[in-house]
């Protein structure tokens, strides 16, 4: 395995952290078991004790979320072992990679679920991955993150990572929280949540937020604005419960793009977007002029609504039905680099200087400029999912049978390209005196489309579990899925359909697992599975020639896991050895270019450790060590998978203490990541980096809490990705610069 020395050093560090595990336990602790219940990976989400689960799942509750202070939903996923997240593009548009699975961007192997239902069945469409349409706030009680395991069989059959966010729910007691947050970059945010009982056995939770800021990378105007409102109602019945919810969101933020590397003044705080360039005119289709506001960035305006019915039927049968409806707009506007930094004299018509189109300033020939594409993506999406399951326990046998159905649609209008030269500075303006800046075609390629797509999925699945002995449990799962897609594309906005798809495919996924209990608080598990990532709309457009040649565009994923788990009174420790192979991955550098078809393999181990002591000290550690390889490729066989670190580690210690008669908590996070390659050719190296975060919570009175949190305390200039559209990688995207948030909240 590559980098063996680095891996052994990391393993030594992890072992040192874990060495106090045995010392910290006593006989009384062994009798007090943590009854953590997880619902991810179970048929219909009935739930299972975490210590009994034969798969790797991570729980992050509201308290931990508060301490992690994530800037986006994707940012929270950094706390999940086996996951590499590039969340440096802003609130939306993250890149999420799972356990060495391949990917050139977005989050092709991530499903975000709310109350057990996928928020959108297609994990990734161009300019849309699941986390982009989900916002965190005070209404969330817990997130579960399941990697591999039974994933390919249950729910939407995601073979990679399924995250399930659970809403807070009401009880007989009326409870509430009001929270105000500000920051050193001008954030103004107000959160509120209230819950209680409406009538006998009918409970409510309502909450949401409103926020405004000029952005952590200051654009000079209110580049981030949003509001969200959530209602969750639960009716308890004599033999079950009914739950309904809706989450209404209108939230947009600046889209932070890669910027030139090794140019003075361009760093983690830099954004090209500003008041002098947010408004623009582009030409699309038959050279029709269109006024746009690039300050609208990326966002989500829509709703995620659904519910569930859970019933205890006669003869020991259980019934659960979970459903979800998502509708809205997920639009994207941005200044996308169309090349590297250049000197003005090399592109100016007169070879000397040029004039600013807004201010009239004359810029000299040694001024840095850059060609920027003014990209517009308008996307209307809708989906409805339903997951129905029956289950029953027979002595040593547990059986479940389910039906999952999904209807997914997307209507897209794009105008990509529209490039012009801008002064390379924060808010830098477009220039007069460069011929292509005023031409209809612009200074680089253009790609415009109008498309519509509908997909339907119908799957039948079953899971069977047999308790062979008091210690050994065996399980098996099967899923038969039919996937249909109808899709058409007008690629020139001229009313002519250039690409049309009428697609149908059926696949059978499976999982086999064994769980062995070493003691009441300790066990091991083994599992193998095979699943599939079915194609959606953009897969056909990007790979149309490959599809016409008979390739079904289905990614086949085979995984194996071997895990150890321990859950004591104050210590949890999970270690999972994983191996996977992904066949049929396609990578397209830019729309219209040929697809590269790959097979990727990965071997690694992930650690998830939590320690909580009565002294007030707690520690969370998650780490991943992996070796990836492209095993089949026309040109890159034997190389490492792009943008996949060989190792990463994240340690979050916390200490509770009294300060002048007040309860206080000091906490921090240290994270480090290995070098990565920015491309499949392995010619672009993205250097590893370390990052420190620090926070303090003080509770001066009952219900009152003050919190200050510093992110990237040392202002590390780490790079998360290169330039996926340029093989020379003259640009890169920095992690977010140092920022400080302060909040005050009152709970009752």
Positions of PLM-derived features:
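N-terminal periplasmic "start-of-domain" segments of outer-membrane beta-barrel proteins
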Residues: 35-68, 93-95
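Gram-negative outer-membrane beta-barrel transporters
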Residues: 469, 572, 577-582, 588, ...
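Short acidic/polar hinge/loop motifs at secondary-structure boundaries
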Residues: 118-147
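Extracytoplasmic beta-strand/coil segments of soluble accessory domains associated
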Residues: 49, 74-118
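C-terminal beta-signal and adjacent terminal beta-strands/loops
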Residues: 671-679, 697-748
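Transmembrane beta-barrel wall of Gram-negative outer-membrane proteins
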Residues: 175-177, 181-267, 297-300, 304-313, ...
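Acidic/polar loop-and-plug regions of large Gram-negative outer-membrane beta-barrel proteins
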Residues: 230, 234-236, 241-308, 331-375, ...
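N-terminal periplasmic accessory domains that precede
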Residues: 73-76, 95-97, 112-113, 130-133, ...
